[in-house]
Regions:
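Short alpha-helical donor nucleotide-sugar binding micro-motif in glycosyltransferases
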Residues: 244-245, 252-257
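Conserved donor-binding/catalytic core segment of Leloir-type glycosyltransferases
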Residues: 5-7, 174-192, 198-201, 260
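Short His-centered aromatic/hydrophobic patch
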Residues: 84-90, 105
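Acidic donor-binding loop of glycosyltransferase active sites
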Residues: 255-273, 288
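A short, histidine- and acid-enriched strand-loop-helix "catalytic/donor-clamping" loop
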Residues: 102-119, 133-135
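Carbohydrate-associated surface elements
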Residues: 142, 162
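Short hydrophobic beta-strand element within catalytic cores of glycosyltransferases
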Residues: 280, 285, 289-292, 302
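Nucleotide-activated donor-binding/catalytic signature segment of Leloir-type glycosyltransferases, i.e.
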Residues: 224-248
Length: 308
């Protein structure tokens, strides 16, 4: 029986977007009666479900890749389909196994780099690997464009991300207290645009500013700068930083706000981009209107006049 083999270096209990995506793909494969197995790293920790269909490979880098490739060659059939979390190194190992391989494309990993290696070695390696895949699955039309730019002969399929509507749904009522409650959630990096949002709130007349509350969820390297900016602009009573939001609390986080806002920007020369913006879809599923910027793949997640 043909199986789907999900090969990924990121899988729960890791918290990254690729980990969550691969977990959801695996879950939906099972619900639709497909035979599926996940091959991932032992360093990801103990599988939350203790699932026998999740195989964790042990080893340091180099040895780890050899063991993964060896496992794929010995424990998969010729007609199995391998779906990889990214094109490298997951995609390379899937391709070397000799099986039919499909690679997920997210956005940032396809942006050009500045170094000699990235310009003249990585560029051609990436082009060949993407072209060699049976298919590349892009999470947005923006990411599809990046794939075609990197590898014009690659077979690209655009499938925007979705959410589980049985899980993401309204769980709490809006506060209706005369205050406009905004929320934002992401890894806190400069390109996410939280500093822009903070400055916009600061620029408002006091009679409007007093009726706004912003709650920012997530951690990251730019958090201290954002906290300092809020303090500098005398917004400590207006803006709160919640830190990491556990999956079990996400629906309440989204549902309790009036509007979800994320002002991601594209900064030339930096390898940062919003390939899709799953948080926008999650927030809308929880009954919260969203505001986003026309950057990266966000237009696929936010439809003007239809929830955003």
């Amino acid at each position: 029986m043909k199986r789907v083999i999900i090969l990924t270096y990121d899988y729960p209990p890791n918290n990254g977007g690729i980990a969550r995506l691969c977990f959801e793909i695996k879950k939906q494969c099972k619900l639709n009666g497909l035979s599926v197995r996940v091959v991932t790293l032992a360093s990801s920790g103990t599988d939350m479900e203790n699932d026998e269909d999740v195989i964790r490979i042990v080893g340091k880098r180099g040895l780890l890749e050899w063991r993964i490739l060896n496992y794929l060659k010995k424990n998969t059939e010729r007609d199995d389909i391998i779906l990889t979390g990214t094109f490298h190194p997951d995609g390379l190992l899937g391709w070397l196994s000799g099986r039919k391989v499909y690679m997920l494309a997210h956005g940032a990993e396809l942006l050009p780099g500045k170094s000699f290696f990235q310009k003249y070695v990585w560029k051609y390696y990436r082009r060949y690997l993407l072209k060699s895949a049976s298919g590349v699955i892009a999470n947005s039309h923006y990411t599809e464009g990046l794939v075609r730019l990197c590898s014009p002969l690659a077979k690209v399929y655009t499938i925007p991300l979705a959410v589980d509507y049985d899980y993401f749904r309204p769980t709490s009522s809006k506060m209706r207290d005369g205050v406009l409650h905004l929320c934002s959630l992401s890894r806190l990096e400069k390109f996410k645009g939280h500093d822009f949002l903070i400055r916009v709130i600061s620029s408002l007349p006091s009679e409007y500013k007093e009726k706004i509350s912003l709650t920012i969820g997530g951690n990251g390297p730019y958090k201290e700068s954002l906290v300092a900016l809020a303090r500098e602009l005398h917004l400590v009573d207006t803006i709160g930083f919640e830190g990491f939001i556990d999956d079990g609390k996400l629906c309440d986080f989204y549902s309790s706000a009036d509007i979800f806002v994320l002002c991601t920007r594209e900064e030339p020369g930096l390898k940062n981009v919003e390939g899709f913006g799953l948080v926008f879809v999650e927030a809308q599923a929880c009954g919260t209107a969203v505001i986003g910027t026309r950057a990266g793949g966000i237009p696929d997640a936010v439809k003007d006049g239809d929830g955003g």
